[in-house]
């Protein structure tokens, strides 16, 4: 599920057919329990106990909620990246070599990727892992969860658990964050917040439209250009400043 939150198609359900809850992956060592009509031999009482267990998983549910909410908070960033994909052909999920073609290590990697331009995602794919090595390309990078700053051009070892998939942000990035919502069109009162990660100058162009119609095909959308000057800690926004807060990291 952690990895799914950074895929173009957000697969937000488990495999247990009964409930399809995101954490419905069963608890046996054999993997997910696939209940179907051939399970008629399971007594009805046991089936009820299984159902209740799947619906109440205090160890997993908070993790699912955390990444689900992050997916929605990053919607302005992801939506802008989707528009970029439509206009340029650049995918949402990008191999590191797309933006670091001269880096031989970036060209060789297949187990981490960029989400849009500025977020580096390193899924944990080894069962029971408590850490994983993450390669950071040239430049300065911030750990999304701790805000710890690291220099790139090398590997760093990141402690991991179920709730902490390694995510890094490129220095100079301007990341728009929305309020948590239950679905994409749900109105929210809180404004969009801009998270700025210091250490380099940066530029970002935020895109938005009505999110419903095909009007974007005829140019009905809004582009807001932003420029961050790191030395003077100055953010310039044009043509129309969005209503919201700005947080500077670093």
What do the predicted segments below correspond to?
Residues 1-170:
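Catalytic-domain carbohydrate-binding cleft regions of carbohydrate-active enzymes
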Residues 164-250:
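Accessory, solvent-exposed terminal regions and/or long lumenal/extracellular loops of proteins
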């Amino acid at each position: 599920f952690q990895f799914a939150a950074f895929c173009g198609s957000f697969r937000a359900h488990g495999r247990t057919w009964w409930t399809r809850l995101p954490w419905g992956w069963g608890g046996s060592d054999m993997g997910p329990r696939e209940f179907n009509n051939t399970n008629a031999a399971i007594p009805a009482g046991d089936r009820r106990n299984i159902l209740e267990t799947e619906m109440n998983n205090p160890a997993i549910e908070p993790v699912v909620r955390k990444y689900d909410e992050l997916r929605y908070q990053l919607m302005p960033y992801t939506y802008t990246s989707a528009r970029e994909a439509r206009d340029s052909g650049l995918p949402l999920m990008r191999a590191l070599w797309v933006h670091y073609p001269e880096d031989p290590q970036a060209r060789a990697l297949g187990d981490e990727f960029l989400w849009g331009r500025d977020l580096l995602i390193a899924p944990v794919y080894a069962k029971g892992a408590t850490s994983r090595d993450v390669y950071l390309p040239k430049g300065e990078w911030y750990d999304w969860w701790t805000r710890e700053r690291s220099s790139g051009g090398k590997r760093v070892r990141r402690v991991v658990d179920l709730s902490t998939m390694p995510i890094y942000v490129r220095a100079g990035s301007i990341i728009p964050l929305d309020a948590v919502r239950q679905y994409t069109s749900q109105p929210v009162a809180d404004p969009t917040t801009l998270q700025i990660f210091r250490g380099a100058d940066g530029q970002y162009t935020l895109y938005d439209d009505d999110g419903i119609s095909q009007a974007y095909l005829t140019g009905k959308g809004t582009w807001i250009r932003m420029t961050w000057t790191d030395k003077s800690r100055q953010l310039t926004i044009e043509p129309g400043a969005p209503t919201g807060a700005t947080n500077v990291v670093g």
